[in-house]
Protein backbone atom coordinates (compact mmCIF):
# COMPACT_ATOMS: atom_id res chain seq x y z
CA UNK A 1 0.00 0.00 0.00
CA UNK A 2 1.30 3.42 -0.85
CA UNK A 3 -0.09 6.85 -0.08
CA UNK A 4 -0.86 8.71 -3.30
CA UNK A 5 -2.51 11.96 -4.39
CA UNK A 6 -6.09 12.96 -3.82
CA UNK A 7 -9.49 12.02 -5.16
CA UNK A 8 -10.91 13.70 -8.30
CA UNK A 9 -13.60 16.37 -8.08
CA UNK A 10 -16.38 13.86 -8.92
CA UNK A 11 -15.46 11.57 -5.99
CA UNK A 12 -17.87 11.64 -3.00
CA UNK A 13 -15.07 12.55 -0.59
CA UNK A 14 -13.45 15.20 -2.81
CA UNK A 15 -12.25 18.08 -0.66
CA UNK A 16 -13.59 16.36 2.50
CA UNK A 17 -10.99 15.01 4.90
CA UNK A 18 -7.68 13.82 3.50
CA UNK A 19 -6.61 14.66 -0.03
CA UNK A 20 -4.65 11.38 -0.02
CA UNK A 21 -5.73 7.81 -0.63
CA UNK A 22 -4.16 4.38 -0.32
CA UNK A 23 -2.73 2.96 -3.55
CA UNK A 24 -3.26 -0.81 -3.65
CA UNK A 25 -0.90 -2.85 -5.82
CA UNK A 26 0.78 0.30 -7.03
CA UNK A 27 -2.60 1.67 -8.09
CA UNK A 28 -2.86 5.35 -8.80
CA UNK A 29 -6.59 5.00 -9.48
CA UNK A 30 -8.75 8.02 -8.87
CA UNK A 31 -10.38 6.49 -5.78
CA UNK A 32 -9.47 4.06 -3.03
CA UNK A 33 -9.84 0.42 -4.13
CA UNK A 34 -12.72 -1.68 -2.79
CA UNK A 35 -11.63 -5.19 -1.77
CA UNK A 36 -13.26 -8.57 -1.15
CA UNK A 37 -11.93 -10.83 1.61
CA UNK A 38 -12.81 -14.48 2.31
CA UNK A 39 -13.53 -15.82 5.79
CA UNK A 40 -10.57 -17.89 7.03
CA UNK A 41 -8.00 -16.03 4.91
CA UNK A 42 -5.28 -13.70 6.15
CA UNK A 43 -4.58 -10.34 4.51
CA UNK A 44 -1.74 -7.94 5.24
CA UNK A 45 -1.64 -4.25 4.34
CA UNK A 46 2.04 -3.30 4.35
CA UNK A 47 3.16 0.33 4.40
CA UNK A 48 6.49 2.03 4.93
CA UNK A 49 7.00 3.04 8.55
CA UNK A 50 6.77 6.73 7.59
CA UNK A 51 3.45 6.18 5.76
CA UNK A 52 2.11 4.06 8.62
CA UNK A 53 2.96 6.75 11.18
CA UNK A 54 1.42 9.52 9.05
CA UNK A 55 -1.52 7.47 7.73
CA UNK A 56 -2.13 4.51 10.10
CA UNK A 57 -4.33 1.98 8.32
CA UNK A 58 -6.99 0.49 10.58
CA UNK A 59 -10.17 -1.52 10.04
CA UNK A 60 -13.60 -0.19 11.00
CA UNK A 61 -17.22 -1.32 11.06
CA UNK A 62 -18.35 1.89 9.37
CA UNK A 63 -16.96 4.39 6.87
CA UNK A 64 -17.16 7.18 9.46
CA UNK A 65 -14.74 5.32 11.77
CA UNK A 66 -17.11 5.24 14.74
CA UNK A 67 -16.15 1.67 15.70
CA UNK A 68 -12.75 0.09 15.08
CA UNK A 69 -12.82 -3.62 14.15
CA UNK A 70 -10.16 -5.58 16.04
CA UNK A 71 -11.14 -9.27 15.87
CA UNK A 72 -8.23 -11.13 14.28
CA UNK A 73 -6.44 -7.84 13.55
CA UNK A 74 -2.77 -7.11 14.31
CA UNK A 75 -1.21 -3.70 13.65
CA UNK A 76 2.48 -2.80 13.86
CA UNK A 77 4.60 0.13 12.71
CA UNK A 78 4.73 -1.32 9.18
CA UNK A 79 1.55 -3.34 8.61
CA UNK A 80 -2.03 -4.10 9.54
CA UNK A 81 -3.04 -7.75 9.18
CA UNK A 82 -6.42 -9.42 9.48
CA UNK A 83 -7.36 -13.07 9.66
CA UNK A 84 -11.04 -12.94 8.75
CA UNK A 85 -12.95 -14.82 11.44
CA UNK A 86 -16.13 -16.79 10.94
CA UNK A 87 -18.98 -14.48 11.85
CA UNK A 88 -17.11 -11.36 10.73
CA UNK A 89 -19.36 -8.54 9.51
CA UNK A 90 -20.21 -8.69 5.81
CA UNK A 91 -18.78 -5.20 5.34
CA UNK A 92 -15.66 -3.64 6.83
CA UNK A 93 -13.74 -0.50 5.91
CA UNK A 94 -10.00 0.10 5.74
CA UNK A 95 -9.34 3.70 6.71
CA UNK A 96 -6.60 6.03 7.82
CA UNK A 97 -7.19 6.46 11.55
CA UNK A 98 -6.12 10.12 11.36
CA UNK A 99 -7.72 11.42 8.15
CA UNK A 100 -11.35 11.26 7.08
CA UNK A 101 -12.36 9.62 3.79
CA UNK A 102 -9.02 7.92 3.20
CA UNK A 103 -9.93 4.29 2.59
CA UNK A 104 -12.66 2.10 1.12
CA UNK A 105 -15.03 -0.82 1.62
CA UNK A 106 -14.08 -4.45 2.20
CA UNK A 107 -16.77 -7.01 1.40
CA UNK A 108 -16.44 -10.19 3.46
CA UNK A 109 -17.64 -13.46 1.91
CA UNK A 110 -17.94 -16.97 3.34
CA UNK A 111 -17.10 -18.71 0.07
CA UNK A 112 -14.49 -18.21 -2.60
CA UNK A 113 -16.41 -16.75 -5.51
CA UNK A 114 -13.37 -16.23 -7.69
CA UNK A 115 -13.04 -12.75 -6.26
CA UNK A 116 -9.72 -10.93 -6.11
CA UNK A 117 -8.58 -13.08 -9.03
CA UNK A 118 -6.07 -10.41 -9.93
CA UNK A 119 -4.14 -11.51 -6.86
CA UNK A 120 -3.77 -15.12 -8.05
CA UNK A 121 -2.22 -18.08 -6.27
CA UNK A 122 -2.16 -18.92 -2.59
CA UNK A 123 0.02 -15.98 -1.64
CA UNK A 124 -0.21 -12.81 -3.66
CA UNK A 125 0.90 -9.26 -3.36
CA UNK A 126 -1.35 -6.30 -3.86
CA UNK A 127 0.80 -3.30 -3.85
CA UNK A 128 2.43 -4.32 -0.90
CA UNK A 129 -0.82 -5.66 0.42
CA UNK A 130 0.08 -9.32 0.84
CA UNK A 131 -2.78 -11.78 0.67
CA UNK A 132 -2.13 -15.09 2.34
CA UNK A 133 -4.67 -17.87 2.00
Regions found by a protein language model. Give the residues of each.
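Extracytoplasmic copper-binding redox domains, predominantly the cupredoxin/blue-copper superfamily
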Residues: 1-114
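Residue-level recognition of conserved structural "scaffold" positions that shape functional pockets
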Residues: 110, 127-128
Amino acid sequence: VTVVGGNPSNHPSYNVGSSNKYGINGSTATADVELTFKVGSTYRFTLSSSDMSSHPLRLYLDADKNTQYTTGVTSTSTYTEITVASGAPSTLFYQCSIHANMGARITVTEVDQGLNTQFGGDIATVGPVTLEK
